[in-house]
From Swiss-Prot:
Its EC number is 3.1.-.-. Belongs to the CRISPR-associated endoribonuclease Cas2 protein family. This is CRISPR-associated endoribonuclease Cas2. It comes from Ligilactobacillus salivarius (strain UCC118) (Lactobacillus salivarius). GO terms for molecular function: metal ion binding; RNA endonuclease activity.
Amino acid sequence: MRLMIIFDLPVETSEERKEYRKFRKNLINEGFIMIQYSVYVRVCVNKKSAEFTEKRIESFLPSKGVVQSLILTEKQYNDMHFLLGKKIKEVRNSAERTIIL
C-alpha cells in the first residue's frame, strides 16, 4: 500500500514558511519521499498501517492550508502514468518485494 499526502500551504509570512518547512521535515522523518512539490508518498505494509500513519500526521499538521491523504494499493500506484518527466528510481520508492544490494 502507499499513503500519498498532497498539500497546499501558505508561505507568505515568515511564520507560514516556518510551518511549511517543519511540516515537510516531519513528513520526511516519517519516511515519505517527495514525488512532486507538495506531493509525498510512503510505502505502508497494509491499510491499518497507512491509517495509523495518517493519525501521526494529524499530530503535526500546520495551522493553515489544505492537507489531503490518499491510500493506494500497489497496483493503483503502479498504474500512475507519467505524461511528462521521469519516474523516481529510489530504492525506498520501489514496489519490488526483494531488493538485492
